[in-house]
């Protein structure tokens, strides 16, 4: 997967009695904060410094932790928190704002999890790089490692993190994931087919969890499924993703991509000729409390610029952080 950071806005109209179908701004103005859940998904591109020592993982952990955009959410899904030291630093920086946190997916299978499911292995070289942080108590934490990946993804415990979060007297279920990357090293195995099977594993988990149908289930993170040029194609992988999860298709605003080499210097350095892609989402299960309005809004805050040295060359870094801040306006009454 190509590194990026994503923020979106999602507004969920309320369940049985009071569905709201206006704009997201109107929805936000019309509801009390106690009746609102705001969720963000954020790919921080913290690859291991053992392999990539010069991408400012520690510096970015401090920038992310201090940034205004990451504040005042209810829940934040973090992707690619692979580097142990940098991810520990980031989670520590977020602790004051988000005191309730999961461990990083696949890093261990200890008591920090209520359950470890799927294909977890302590001998896999890399963890799954997903964590969830919350302002509100997390009543249950489950990590699930996918059955299969291809290419370099086979060397990581990729999967998803499930959290049961209690805001006031209402439970909301948030799943954060990072699906199979598009990779030529997969050989004859189709990365898209691997992603489809991973989505089926998520859906099977949700069904087997027997979550009450009057509670919201949100699935978010780096899906590695490109929306661009696929929205009007019912046979596309993009359309298939929503069918497999039986999830609502959100509306989209803000920047038109969640990974864009024209706005992110690390992406440009690694993939200078690659086209922009829209790969990150937060969506809601239609098998449970179904929002009347969902919007994914992509914003682009910029980091300060700094210079690193790699192979005796100075590289100037200025990252435009592409973020999906998803605000879920739901009834908590």
UniProtKB/Swiss-Prot annotation:
Q: Which GO terms describe its biological process?
A: killing of cells of another organism
Keyword Lipid biosynthesis in annotation: no
CDD domains (UniProt xref) = nSMase
Signal sequence, start to end: 1-26
Subcellular locations according to the entry? Secreted
Documented EC number(s): 3.1.4.12
Q: How is it modified after translation?
A: The N-terminus is blocked.
Task: Show the catalytic activity.
Answer: a sphingomyelin + H2O = phosphocholine + an N-acylsphing-4-enine + H(+)
Q: What class of enzyme is it?
A: hydrolase
Describe regulators of its activity.
Activated by cobalt and manganese ions.
- Per its UniProt record, what SUPFAM superfamilies does this chain match? DNase I-like
- Pfam families registered for this protein in UniProt: Exo_endo_phos
- Has UniProt tagged this entry with the keyword Iron? no
Gene3D superfamilies per the UniProt record, alphabetical: Endonuclease/exonuclease/phosphatase
Keywords, A to Z?
Cytolysis, Disulfide bond, Hemolysis, Hydrolase, Secreted, Signal
List cofactor names only.
Mg(2+)
* Disulfide-linked positions: 150-186
Task: Tell me the function of this protein.
Answer: Required, with sphingomyelinase, to effect target cell lysis (hemolysis).
Q: What is this protein called?
A: Sphingomyelinase C
Question: Which gene is annotated as encoding this protein in its UniProt record?
Answer: cerB
């Amino acid at each position: 997967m190509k590194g990026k950071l994503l923020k979106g806005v999602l507004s969920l109209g309320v369940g049985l009695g009071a569905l709201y179908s206006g704009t997201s701004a109107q929805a936000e103005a019309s509801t009390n904060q106690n009746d609102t859940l705001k969720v963000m998904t954020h790919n921080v591109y913290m690859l291991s410094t053992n392999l990539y020592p010069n991408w400012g993982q520690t510096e970015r952990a401090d920038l992310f932790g201090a940034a205004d955009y990451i504040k005042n959410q209810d829940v934040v899904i973090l992707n690619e928190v692979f580097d142990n030291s940098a991810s520990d630093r980031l989670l520590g920086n977020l602790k004051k704002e988000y005191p309730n946190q999961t461990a990083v997916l696949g890093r261990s299978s200890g008591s920090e999890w209520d359950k470890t499911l799927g294909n977890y292995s302590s001998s896999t070289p890399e963890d799954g790089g997903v964590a969830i942080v919350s302002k509100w108590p997390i009543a249950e934490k489950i990590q699930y490692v996918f059955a299969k990946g291809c290419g370099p993804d086979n060397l990581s415990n990729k999967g998803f993190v499930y959290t049961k979060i209690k805001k006031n007297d209402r439970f909301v279920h948030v799943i954060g994931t990072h699906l199979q990357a598009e990779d030529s090293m997969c050989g004859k195995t189709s990365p898209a087919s691997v992603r489809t099977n991973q989505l089926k594993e998520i859906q099977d988990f949700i069904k087997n969890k027997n979550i009450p149908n009057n509670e919201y289930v949100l699935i978010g993170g780096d899906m590695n499924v490109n929306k661009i040029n696929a929205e009007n194609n019912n046979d596309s992988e993009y359309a298939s993703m929503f069918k497999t999860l039986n999830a609502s298709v959100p509306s989209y605003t803000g920047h038109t991509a969640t990974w864009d080499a024209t706005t992110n210097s690390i992406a440009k350095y690694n993939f200078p000729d690659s086209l922009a892609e829209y790969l990150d989402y937060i969506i809601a299960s239609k098998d449970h409390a179904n929002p009347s309005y969902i919007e994914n809004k992509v914003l682009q805050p910029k980091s300060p610029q700094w210079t690193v040295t790699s192979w005796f060359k100075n590289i100037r870094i200025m990252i435009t952080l592409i973020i999906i801040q998803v605000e879920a306006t739901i009834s908590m009454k």
